[in-house]
């Protein structure tokens, strides 16, 4: 279980973030080396097992029924299709396979039973298994754990003050309750946020403060950069400043020494140099493969070449 060092108030987080960049990167790298192999990067693959028709109104998401993104809806994938993806991901070097469904919440019944069978089958490949399926009740979290689920992803997205500007159909409290249910079942918590939705630096610091208040703190923290999608409310958002991303990664690493800091959405828009700086700042995981749910993402071969250039290597053990 992970605990964030104290203090982690907004003012303390701001102090860490605003250090001169050489000092910030030095401290982040020092912490990173004390807790992780600095040459290793865990490769993860995310599969969209049910696409579109989500009743939530998350302003960034192409899968919402409230937006006109033109995305074609797809029903829950078959077990054979999911296993083919998982086996290909493992062959390409991924050690964690994540399955995402565009649901508001898990509902008991045949679809959930099919997801449980997917979890059991992927776990049998000796891979870490993660799901992101919306809100989850305690008894459902227990069943996922029994099926072999390693981690459950449920992002806070942003700080609590800015959150209502992004989502109104699900409260911050709803998200926290799901995270508590997952943790209570003994499932690792994967929880992070999205940068570039119009939030302020203070909103980003409040996100980190909220993550630090979780007990246990997340084992996995995805840091996403918004990929604007036509037809969504955030389609015209400005890109995240590169050094703002680097500072956010470094600050996250310092605050959460044991966590896997996952450089997630938006990598296709990042230069190799920016990604290298993020690794120096303490990122030690990426999502690899042609898509991240519905948005384009670097292919496995591209990521393998990047790691080779940097003298880094995929993490081979769970």
UniProtKB/Swiss-Prot annotation:
[4Fe-4S] cluster binds at residues 54, 58, 61. It catalyses: (4R,5S)-dethiobiotin + (sulfur carrier)-SH + 2 reduced [2Fe-2S]-[ferredoxin] + 2 S-adenosyl-L-methionine = (sulfur carrier)-H + biotin + 2 5'-deoxyadenosine + 2 L-methionine + 2 oxidized [2Fe-2S]-[ferredoxin]. Pathway: Cofactor biosynthesis; biotin biosynthesis; biotin from 7,8-diaminononanoate: step 2/2. Keywords: 2Fe-2S, 4Fe-4S, Biotin biosynthesis, Iron, Iron-sulfur, Metal-binding, S-adenosyl-L-methionine, Transferase. Binds 1 [4Fe-4S] cluster. The cluster is coordinated with 3 cysteines and an exchangeable S-adenosyl-L-methionine. Binds 1 [2Fe-2S] cluster. The cluster is coordinated with 3 cysteines and 1 arginine. Residues 36-258 form the Radical SAM core domain. Homodimer. Belongs to the radical SAM superfamily. Biotin synthase family. This is Biotin synthase. It comes from Gloeobacter violaceus (strain ATCC 29082 / PCC 7421). The gene is bioB.
């Amino acid at each position: 279980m992970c605990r964030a060092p104290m203090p982690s108030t907004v003012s303390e987080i701001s102090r860490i973030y605003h250090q001169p960049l050489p000092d910030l990167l030095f401290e982040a790298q020092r912490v990173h080396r004390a807790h992780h192999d600095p040459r290793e990067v865990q490769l993860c693959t995310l599969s969209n097992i049910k696409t579109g028709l989500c009743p939530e109104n998350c302003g960034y998401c192409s899968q919402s029924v409230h937006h006109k993104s033109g995305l074609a809806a797809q029903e829950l994938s078959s077990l054979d299709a999911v296993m083919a993806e998982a086996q290909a991901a493992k062959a390409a070097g991924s050690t964690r396979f994540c399955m995402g469904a565009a649901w508001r919440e898990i509902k008991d019944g045949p679809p959930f039973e099919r997801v449980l069978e997917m979890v059991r089958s992927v776990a049998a490949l000796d891979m870490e298994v993660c799901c992101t399926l919306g809100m989850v009740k305690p008894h459902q979290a227990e069943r996922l754990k029994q099926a072999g689920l390693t981690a459950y992803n449920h992002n806070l997205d942003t700080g609590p003050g800015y959150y209502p500007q992004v989502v109104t159909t699900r409260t911050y409290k709803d998200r926290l309750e799901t995270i508590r249910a997952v943790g209570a079942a003994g499932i690792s918590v994967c929880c992070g946020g999205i940068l570039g939705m119009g939030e302020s630096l203070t909103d980003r610091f409040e996100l980190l403060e909220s993550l630090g208040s979780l007990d246990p703190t997340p084992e996995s923290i995805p840091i996403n950069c918004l990929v604007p999608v036509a037809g969504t409310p955030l389609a015209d958002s400005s890109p995240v400043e590169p050094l703002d991303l680097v500072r956010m990664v470094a600050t996250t690493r310092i605050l959460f020494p044991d966590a896997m800091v996952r450089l997630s959405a938006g990598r296709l828009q990042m230069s190799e140099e920016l990604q290298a700086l993020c690794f120096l700042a303490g990122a030690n995981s990426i999502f690899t493969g042609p898509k991240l749910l519905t948005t384009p993402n670097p292919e496995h071969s591209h990521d393998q070449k990047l790691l080779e250039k940097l003298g880094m290597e995929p993490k081979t053990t769970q």
